[in-house]
Design a protein with these regions (language model features):
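Short, Lys/Arg-rich amphipathic alpha-helical interaction segments
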Residues: 114-138
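Short, charged/polar, Gly/Pro-enriched secondary-structure boundary elements
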Residues: 10, 39-42, 116-120
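Short, structured motif recognition centered on aromatic/hydrophobic residues
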Residues: 1-3, 7, 33, 81-85, ...
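Extended intrinsically disordered, low-complexity coil regions enriched in Ser, Thr, Gly, Ala
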Residues: 9-26, 88-108
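Short, basic amphipathic alpha-helical segments that act as recognition/interaction helices
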Residues: 24-39, 107-116
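Extended macromolecule-engaging scaffold surfaces
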Residues: 1-18, 40, 49-50
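Helix-adjacent hinge/juxtasegments
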Residues: 32-69
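Beta-rich strand-turn-strand
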Residues: 73-96
Length: 138
C-alpha cells in the first residue's frame, strides 16, 4: 500500500528514519502506527496508567505493555510512501488489498475498508463507504 502524503509529511517532520512501528489498536479492530518518538510518549502514558491501576487492575498494565511494545513490527517506506504491511498485522486487522489510513494526532490507524464501514462510529463508516463506493465506480 502507499502511505498518504499527510502521513509521509508528518513522519518526515518527526524523524529522520524512514519507518514506523505498527501494532494492534487498544480497543478497535485496526492497526495503530507511530514513530519511535511517539513510542516514548506511549511508555510514559503506560507508566502513568500502571500507577493509577495497580491496586484495582494489576494485570491491565502487563497486557497494555505487551500490546504496545511486544506485539509490534517495524515497517519501512520509500520515497513514494510504499509499504508492505507484515502478514501478521494484515491478518490481525483483516486488511485485504486496500486499506484506510486515519490520522489520530500522534499516531495513525490502518483499517480494513470493510471493517471500518461496519464500525459503529458514523464518521469512520462514512469515510470507508466513500472509498469502497469509489473503488466500485472505477
Amino acid at each position: 500500500m502507499i502511505l498518504p502524503p499527510f502521513v509521509r509529511a508528518t513522519l518526515g517532520r518527526r524523524t529522520e528514519v524512514r519507518g514506523f512501528l505498527v501494532g494492534g489498536h487498544e480497543c478497535d479492530p485496526c492497526l495503530v502506527a507511530y514513530d519511535r518518538g511517539y513510542a516514548r510518549i506511549l511508555h510514559q502514558d503506560s507508566e502513568r496508567r500502571r500507577i493509577a491501576e495497580e491496586a484495582t487492575l494489576p494485570e491491565a498494565s502487563a497486557k497494555r505493555l505487551r500490546r504496545i511494545f511486544g506485539f509490534v513490527e517495524e515497517v519501512g517506506f520509500g520515497d513514494d510512501g510504499a509499504i508492505v504491511l507484515p502478514p501478521m498485522m494484515r491478518r490481525r486487522a483483516r486488511i485485504g488489498a486496500r486499506a484506510l489510513v486515519i490520522g489520530t494526532g500522534g499516531a495513525f490507524e490502518i483499517w480494513s475498508l470493510e471493517v471500518a464501514r461496519d464500525h459503529p462510529d458514523p464518521a469512520l463508516a462514512e469515510i470507508a463507504s466513500f472509498y469502497l463506493d469509489e473503488q466500485h465506480a472505477a
